[in-house]
């Protein structure tokens, strides 16, 4: 019972009698020199993995291999961020090397991806039909949350904070279409089409570059066109949140939602 109370109060550590000197020494060392120990271990671990990552970058030939590289580099960026590490420059160099090599990979394969939609990686216009519609078709109530300008490393930072309320059963990456600008990529997600296809099939929903109107004003209408094309008759809700204060207002409405598909666009992250 005493141990449970101590753990519940988030104590740093505890010793159980009878205590020998080595236990006391280990406990003191862990707390007095914790930062130095963690830093040394992190530096050593990254140094050992450096050559493996370089080899991954040099030999990557599939989108799956590049996704694995992104996960690995992001993991190390987050681990080294909290230590005064001599490895920062090495990691920055490795990230730059990966970015340059990935750009060449995309230039080499991008046209082929467009010409072969059945075998290409999942792209912006494929997200809903690949990941969202199947869940709704199975009877799941789905909240599809799109966070603008939200990077993978930012997701990995907030993921542990959400673990109190949510369990991540599966984590997938997809490949954005080019250009990755919101006005193209996000419209492609909701329409399930490339920007050129949107312009040709739904010219009344396409907003040209020289027009002052926001280029993403028709997302809900584009979503409806995709539902119609795939003969999805279920109801849906759509919310676009442009400021953080509005979040509290719409979260109160979520409990009463009966629609199987609920779309939320968070459009203010880059303003924080």
Predicted regions located by residue number:
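Alpha4 helix (beta4-alpha4-beta5 surface) of REC/receiver domains from two-component response regulators
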Residues: 1-13
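A short acidic (Asp/Glu
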Residues: 3-6, 27, 135, 154-159
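C-terminal output helix
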Residues: 19-28
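The C-terminal output helix
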Residues: 29-42
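Active-site-proximal alpha/beta segments of enzymes that process anionic O-linked groups
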Residues: 39-51, 152-259
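Anion-binding catalytic surfaces of enzymes that hydrolyze or transfer phosphate/sulfate esters
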Residues: 56-136, 140, 231-272
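Beta-strand elements within well-structured catalytic alpha/beta cores of enzymes
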Residues: 139-158, 189, 261-267
């Amino acid at each position: 019972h005493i141990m449970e109370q101590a753990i519940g109060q988030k104590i740093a550590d505890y010793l159980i009698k009878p205590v020998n000197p080595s236990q006391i020494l280990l406990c003191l060392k862990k707390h007095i020199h914790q930062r130095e120990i963690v830093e040394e271990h992190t530096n050593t671990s990254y140094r050992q993995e450096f050559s493996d990552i370089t080899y991954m970058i040099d030999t990557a030939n599939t989108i799956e291999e590049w996704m694995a590289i992104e996960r690995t580099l992001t993991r190390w960026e987050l681990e080294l961020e909290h230590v005064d590490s001599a490895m920062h420059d090495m990691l920055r160099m490795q990230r730059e090397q990966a970015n340059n090599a990935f750009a060449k990979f995309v230039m080499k394969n991008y046209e082929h991806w467009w010409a072969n939609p059945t075998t290409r990686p999942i792209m912006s216009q494929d997200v809903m039909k690949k990941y969202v519609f199947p869940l709704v078709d199975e009877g799941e109530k789905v909240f599809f949350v799109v966070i603008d300008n939200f990077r993978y490393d930012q997701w990995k930072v907030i993921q542990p904070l959400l673990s109190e309320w949510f369990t991540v059963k599966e984590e997938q990456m997809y490949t954005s279409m080019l250009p990755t600008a919101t006005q193209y990529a996000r419209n492609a997600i909701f329409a399930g089409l490339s920007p050129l296809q949107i312009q040709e099939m739904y010219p009344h929903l396409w907003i040209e570059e020289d027009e002052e109107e926001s280029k993403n004003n028709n997302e809900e209408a584009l979503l409806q066109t995709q539902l119609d094309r795939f003969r999805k008759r279920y109801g849906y809700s759509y919310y676009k949140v442009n400021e953080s204060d509005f979040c509290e207002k719409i979260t109160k409405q979520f409990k009463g939602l009966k629609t199987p598909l609920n779309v939320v666009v968070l459009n203010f992250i880059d303003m924080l």
